[in-house]
């Protein structure tokens, strides 16, 4: 994406506007910075981790998860389109886009289901970042309590796995999760 001169073509801008929540001015500014940070036009995992660290996301496990979600075509690099779409989902996505993004983070192996083991890995990593979890009601949880509550409220069919549809339904019923998704807009 982008021509030899390092600028976005009109068609590329239109494509990205249609697949993101950024306008043409923002896309051009993002592209300029992206090309400055990565003249090759792609970001490898190490470069992505450096960018995430600069943005305040220092946990390596979380950086790996984010990289895997951004890298849609699974070629071990992130191109500009993947970067824009991932950034758009996190920062400006609709509630449904944010729910799907979060599900992709939790579904570490990409099989379409969240397991207790995957949730435990995620929450332990997040717990390291924030130290404790507090809900909107002020109630504190440790990661294992959250996992139990998470599966109790979302695993509708009781099979020990949470599908995307179960996750969507459960998320929309949980004010703590909705509040967390809103925080991503700030």
From Swiss-Prot:
Binding sites annotated in the UniProt record for Ca(2+) 1: 107, 109, 111, 113, 118
InterPro entries named among the record's database cross-references: EF-hand-dom_pair, EF_Hand_1_Ca_BS, EF_hand_dom, Recoverin
Organism expressing this protein natively: Dictyostelium discoideum
Keywords: Calcium, Developmental protein, Metal-binding, Repeat
Lineage: Eukaryota, Amoebozoa, Evosea, Eumycetozoa, Dictyostelia
Signal peptide (from-to): none
Function summary: May prevent cells from entering development prematurely in the presence of environmental nutrients.
Record-level GO BP terms: regulation of signal transduction; sorocarp development
Residue ranges of every copy of the EF-hand domain listed in the record: 40-58, 66-93, 94-129, 142-177
Pfam families with a match to the protein in the record: EF-hand_7 (PF13499), EF-hand_8 (PF13833)
Descriptive protein name: Calcium-binding protein NCSA
Gene3D superfamilies named in the record: EF-hand
Family to which this protein belongs: Belongs to the recoverin family.
UniProt keyword Ribosomal protein, yes or no: no
């Amino acid at each position: 994406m982008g021509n030899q001169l390092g600028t976005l073509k009109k068609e590329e801008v239109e494509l990205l506007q249609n697949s993101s929540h950024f306008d043409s001015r923002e896309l051009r500014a993002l592209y300029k910075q992206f090309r400055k940070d990565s003249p090759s036009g792609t970001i490898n995992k190490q470069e992505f981790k450096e960018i995430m660290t600069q943005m305040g996301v220092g946990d390596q496990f979380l950086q790996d998860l984010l990289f895997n979600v951004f890298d849609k075509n699974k070629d071990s690099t992130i191109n500009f389109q993947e970067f824009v779409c991932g950034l758009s989902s996190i920062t400006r996505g609709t509630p449904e886009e944010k729910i799907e993004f979060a599900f992709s983070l939790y579904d570490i192996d990409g099989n379409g289901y969240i397991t207790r083991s995957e949730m435990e890995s995620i929450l332990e990593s997040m717990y390291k970042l924030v130290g404790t979890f507090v809900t909107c009601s002020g109630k504190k949880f440790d990661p294992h309590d959250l996992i139990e509550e998470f599966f109790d409220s979302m695993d509708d069919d009781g099979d020990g796995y949470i599908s995307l549809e179960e996750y969507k339904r459960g998320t929309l019923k949980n004010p703590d999760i909705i509040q967390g998704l809103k925080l991503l807009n700030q």
